[in-house]
UniProtKB/Swiss-Prot annotation:
Keyword terms of this UniProt record: Ribonucleoprotein, Ribosomal protein
GO cellular-component term (any): cytosolic small ribosomal subunit
PROSITE patterns: RIBOSOMAL_S9
Keyword Ribonucleoprotein in record: yes
GO BP term, example: translation
Keyword Ribosomal protein listed: yes
A Gene Ontology molecular function term of the record: RNA binding
UniProt region (Disordered), positions on chain: 102-130
Protein name per the record: Small ribosomal subunit protein uS9
Species per Swiss-Prot/TrEMBL record: Listeria monocytogenes serovar 1/2a (strain ATCC BAA-679 / EGD-e)
Gene name linked to the record: rpsI
Source species, domain of life: Bacteria
Family: Belongs to the universal ribosomal protein uS9 family.
Length: 130
């Protein structure tokens, strides 16, 4: 019989993560690499674990992730969002715990665009009085 899999798509900044949860012993694999090799910062690894900790399912599921776009922070946020959405498919009763922790909300903050006449989004060229 085919193994049960739960899917979730997460987004953050310009990153998109496709997450699969498979019943297992808690392994996390990101882009076919161990997550500790892929994400070198412990703080971002904690971010990824948040949905599993909030629902007390840490160690019950293997997390298999394909993620592209953005940097470490964006990708970690996208994975967190995807894991939270996949956990909803596992059991809808996780919704209150995930919702109260703010893990189901897509973080809509994006990089502000550069404006003409300015050096960046808001940075103006140096002003000289004389």
């Amino acid at each position: 019989m085919a193994q049960v899999q739960y899917y979730g798509t997460g987004r953050r900044k310009s990153s998109v993560a496709r997450v699969r949860l498979v019943p297992g012993d808690g392994k996390i694999v990101i882009n076919n690499r161990d997550w500790e090799d892929y994400i070198p910062f412990a703080a971002l690894r904690e971010v990824i674990k948040q949905p599993l900790v909030a629902t007390e399912t840490l160690g019950n599921y293997d997390v298999l992730v394909n993620v592209h776009g953005g940097g470490y922070t964006g990708q970690a946020g996208a994975i967190r969002h995807g894991v939270a959405r996949a956990l909803l498919q596992v059991a809808p009763e996780y919704r209150p715990a995930l919702k109260s922790a703010g893990l189901l909300t897509r973080d809509s903050r994006m990089k502000e665009r550069k404006k003409p006449g300015l050096k960046g989004a808001r940075r103006a060229p140096q002003f000289s009085k004389r």
